[in-house]
Curated annotation (Swiss-Prot):
It is an enzyme of class 1 (oxidoreductase). InterPro entries: Cbr1-like_FAD-bd_dom (IPR008333), FAD-bd_FR_type (IPR017927), Flavoprot_Pyr_Nucl_cyt_Rdtase (IPR001709), FNR_nucleotide-bd (IPR039261), Globin (IPR000971), Globin-like_sf (IPR009050), Globin/Proto (IPR012292), Hmp (IPR023950). SUPFAM superfamilies: Ferredoxin reductase-like, C-terminal NADP-linked domain (SSF52343), Globin-like (SSF46458), Riboflavin synthase domain-like (SSF63380). Residues 150-255 form the FAD-binding FR-type domain. Keywords: Detoxification, FAD, Flavoprotein, Heme, Iron, Metal-binding, NAD, NADP, Oxidoreductase, Oxygen transport, Transport. Its EC number is 1.14.12.17. Consists of two distinct domains; an N-terminal heme-containing oxygen-binding domain and a C-terminal reductase domain with binding sites for FAD and NAD(P)H. This is Flavohemoprotein. GO terms for molecular function: FAD binding; heme binding; metal ion binding; nitric oxide dioxygenase NAD(P)H activity; oxygen binding; oxygen carrier activity. It comes from Photobacterium profundum (strain SS9). Is involved in NO detoxification in an aerobic process, termed nitric oxide dioxygenase (NOD) reaction that utilizes O(2) and NAD(P)H to convert NO to nitrate, which protects the bacterium from various noxious nitrogen compounds. Therefore, plays a central role in the inducible response to nitrosative stress.
Amino acid sequence: MISQQTIDIVKATAPVVAETGPKLTAHFYERMFNHNPELKDIFNMSNQRNGDQREALFNAICAYANNIDNLAALLPAVEKIAHKHTSFMITAEQYQIVGGHLLATIDELLSPGQEVLDAWGEAYGVLANVFITREEAIYQENEEKTGGWRGTREFTLIEKTQESDVITSFTFKPADGGTVSNFKPGQYLGIYLTPDAFEFQEIRQYSLSSAPRTDNYRISVKREEGGKVSNYLHNELTVGDTVQLAAPAGDFFLDVPATTPVTLISAGVGLTPTLSMLDALTEHQASVHWLHATENGSHHAFKDYVNTLADKYDHISATTWYREPLATDRPAEDFDYQGMIDLKAVASQLIDPAMHYYFCGPVGFMQHVAKQLIELDVQEDNIHYECFGPHKVL
């Protein structure tokens, strides 16, 4: 338990910390990487350069300080972050390193005095223990599953399939010939890469793009312009190569009774977690609607597969939007609507108040979808979404 004195001090000084803004997290990361450069093998340095990770940390610090007397309000965020941490193999010792640099940053930028530093130190220790406990439980759960493991495990690339001009699928099988653990549709894998051309080890999370299988995992990756890892996977990784994988994780997953209707909404490579869900919903007892937006036919991954499912199963329907169709793209055959996703076009399919919505894509797209769902009076508990990269509140 956190002492009342600590709660009072943290809440009183939280506005001062908040006013420091991005300067605080920039100083923190610079300090930490200077003193502990080995952590560059864990943190996504691309997210450091674009500021996403700094923003995420700053938001987390402010949220914790503002809710220090109501930790239950933080549990959803704790669950999301804890799953991500397990895919990075974060350890209790690393929490000590981070805490030390966070307190030193507050001291160096604000000079608040020892009493304030002690209060923030106590508060950080309590939160760190919450994460350490939850993450250890996830590690144990992953290890105890049939086909499960702790840490990383060597896998061999057995199939590489181009799904569109920008998306390629990679299927991995355990190098030891064993089985793989089950996962929940919507979850992701952590992949660890250390090519000679990389300055640091690179760790990325990619959504699993099929329903669970017993002997392999499939991810589908978009080639990002300037993306170090995605371009390496597309250009360099070949069948027979090996990689290290962390066990599946993630708090965004299909979790509804078989009688609950579901709508899956995606844009671009955001279809990967929802495709895993669709793959698992072929025997669902309620309606399933697949709504997907992409640039045009050359970017449209898994078109034939999704259409085959929609033709085969009466409870599955599929609707597609192309933002800028090519001259060769045929309306009503290759796509249904032009432009951005407009849920009014399929409003008759979305009238059941029990329906759950799962969506993923670029942040702007998800904000667009969330706004429309709210306008349709969809209950917040029925809305689920995933951000690729640091989480953002829509």
